[in-house]
Structures are given as structure tokens and as C-alpha cells.
């Protein structure tokens, strides 16, 4: 059985491959030795650049509390620099939800089953 770190890394790599298969240039950002990183992936396509943090979730709710302070600071600076909205890619059961950062920030906690519009393949990311 994989530990949480390996499960997370596996999903980050999977998400990078999914984006690459959809024509994005996607790059996994390696964590620093202390484990910190601003977000997990950067993806670029047709002049759009996306910052994406990948999370796995075993229950049906996802909370803003799952984002670390350095990730929130990085997303806020990303936006101040005039970039597109960052996303949190959440894997739950067999689905991936692409949750816009501002949506999670405004709602604090979301029930994943209520986000059918954010499922991978539905949201035009």
C-alpha cells in the first residue's frame, strides 16, 4: 500500500500526463529539499499559463484548509502578476475535479459531488 506522499506524487505525475495528452506543455515542479513548492504543476497552451496544485481526497468534501500558506501566497502572487486563475486538481474516487482557486477561496469548503461542472473533461481548461 502506498503512503500519502507516494499517492500524491503519483497523482501529480498522472495529472501532468493528462495535460500533456490534451496538448498542454505541462511541467511538474520538483519540491525543494524542505518539501515546499509554490504549486505542483505549470501548464501552458495557446498563450495561457495555469498554475495547478494537485490533491487527493478520500471523503466527499474538500476544504481550503488543505492548501498550505505558501501555496496560497503563490496563487495570490500568480494572480497579481496578471495570469489566469490557478486551479486545484482534486482526485476523488475515479474522478478529477478542476476547482478554480477563487471558487474554493470564496466557498472555503465544497462538496465534490456538487461540482459536476468542474469534472475533468467538462471544464474547458
Predicted regions and their residues:
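Acidic-basic catalytic patches of nuclease active cores, encompassing PD-(D/E)XK
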Residues: 1-32, 96
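Active-site metal-binding core of divalent-cation-utilizing nuclease and nuclease-like domains
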Residues: 25-47
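Short connector loops at helix/strand junctions that flank enzyme active sites
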Residues: 36-38, 47-51, 70, 81-83
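Conserved catalytic cores of phosphodiester-cleaving nucleases, focusing on short active-site segments
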Residues: 41-43, 47-60
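Active-site-adjacent loop/helix micro-motif of nuclease/hydrolase catalytic cores
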Residues: 58-72
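Mixed-charge (Asp/Glu-Lys/Arg
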Residues: 73-76, 107, 124-125
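Nucleic-acid nuclease catalytic cores
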Residues: 76-104
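Charged phosphate-binding loop/patch that engages nucleotide di/tri-phosphates or the phosphate backbone
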Residues: 109-125
Amino acid at each position: 500500500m502506498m503512503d500519502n506522499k507516494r499517492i500524491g506524487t503519483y497523482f501529480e505525475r498522472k495529472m501532468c500526463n493528462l495535460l500533456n495528452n490534451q496538448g498542454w506543455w505541462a511541467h511538474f515542479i520538483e519540491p525543494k529539499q524542505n518539501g515546499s513548492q509554490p504549486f505542483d504543476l505549470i501548464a501552458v497552451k495557446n498563450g495561457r499559463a495555469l498554475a495547478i496544485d494537485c490533491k487527493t481526497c478520500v471523503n466527499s468534501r474538500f476544504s481550503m484548509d488543505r492548501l498550505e500558506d505558501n501555496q496560497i501566497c503563490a496563487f495570490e502572487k500568480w494572480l497579481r502578476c496578471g495570469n489566469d486563475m490557478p486551479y486545484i486538481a482534486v482526485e476523488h474516487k475515479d474522478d478529477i475535479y478542476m476547482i478554480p482557486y477563487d471558487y474554493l477561496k470564496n466557498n472555503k469548503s465544497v462538496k465534490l459531488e456538487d461540482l459536476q461542472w468542474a469534472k475533468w473533461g467538462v471544464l474547458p481548461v
